[in-house]
Amino acid sequence: MKNVTGTATSMKRIELSRRSPQYWRVTLNHPPLNVFGPESIPQLNEIVTALETDKEVKVVVFDSAVEGFFLTHYDFLAKIEDTTALPPGPTGLQPLPDMLVRLSRASVVSIASIRGLTRWIEPFGTFCRDGSER
């Protein structure tokens, strides 16, 4: 995205809401389809790091602000260098698998509240307890 001066800006695509010290909600918000891309990685990393270091949080629920879509796929239109240039995470893995492994090891209950299309959910959902109305 570009701002009024034409320079690139970063949109907040993943929003953290601390509902209480023990219960957090993470909302995916990248309309129209909730694609995940290189600009999302630092945002998710910040949240995963907070989950690892906060001793009070017990439950985190991942949901979507985009009606009909939970998480569809990786942004294949982004420059490949924007993803491959990101440094490995603390596990030594590339950023995305690093965060998924760290989420699976975190001492919190992680729930994916799915209300819509889930094309790319397998790697993400595998590391969460899956919750749905259906």
What are these model-derived regions, one by one?
Residues 35, 71, 121:
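Residues that form or flank phosphate/diphosphate-binding pockets in enzymes
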Residues 26, 62, 75, 124-127:
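Hydrophobic/aromatic residues within transmembrane alpha-helices
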Residues 34, 77, 133:
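Nucleotide phosphate-binding site architecture
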Residues 97-134:
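Glycine-rich beta-to-alpha active-site loop
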Residues 64-99:
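Glycine- (often His-adjacent) and acidic-residue-rich active-site loop
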Residues 2-63, 67, 101:
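Conserved CoA-thioester-binding segment of acyl-CoA-metabolizing enzymes
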